[in-house]
Amino acid sequence: MKIFYMGLEPYEGRYTLQLQDWTERAYKKRGVEYVVVPGTTIDDSKAIVTGQVLDAHGRSYFGMSQFMNLVQMMKAGEITKDDAIFFEDMFQPGMESLPYILMQSPEEYRPKIYLRCLAQAVDPDDFVHVWGMAKWMSLYEQMCNEIPNVNIL
């Protein structure tokens, strides 16, 4: 089994800067075979400008570029049913392409999917409630529940 790691973009003021390093060290220590799926940052500032948890533009840009790379790997047959895709955050721009692709792919190319739910609409104290985003976020969460082979952590 190989883990395809979908990490978060690095921000100076958040734990995300260290998160990929911590994860890679843990995988190496345990002898886990893994691939870091790369994304492209919108700029080099590593700052949160719009939003309060992650930068709204930066998260969207990084997540979509990362998903484009994941889709290329899936199309090339690099990811199989024996593998896992681990998303560091349940909210990942481009996530709707997963059920779209997986439900039309042969079983042999349907990996296990792991999504880390850090808060989202299920948490009444999450920022999505403050910014009026709870309705669409809860619908997004329902979509995530329908992804084949999904496990929400």
Regions flagged by a language model, labelled:
Residues 1-44, 81, 109:
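N-terminal subdomain of nucleotide-sugar transferases
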Residues 9-12, 41-43, 90-93, 119-122:
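Short, solvent-exposed loop/turn segments at secondary-structure junctions
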Residues 15-18, 45-50, 97-100, 125-129:
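Short aromatic-enriched loop/helix-cap "lid" or pocket-rim segments at secondary-structure transitions
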Residues 43-63:
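N-terminal beta-loop-helix "entrance" segment that forms/cooperates
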Residues 56-100, 138:
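An amphipathic, basic-hydrophobic alpha-helix
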Residues 59-65, 126-133:
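Short, flexible loop segments at the rims of nucleotide/cofactor-binding pockets, characterized by
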Residues 84-89, 103-126, 152:
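Active-site proximal beta-strand in glycosyltransferases
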Residues 131-152:
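Membrane-proximal helix-turn-helix segments that form the acceptor-binding/catalytic region
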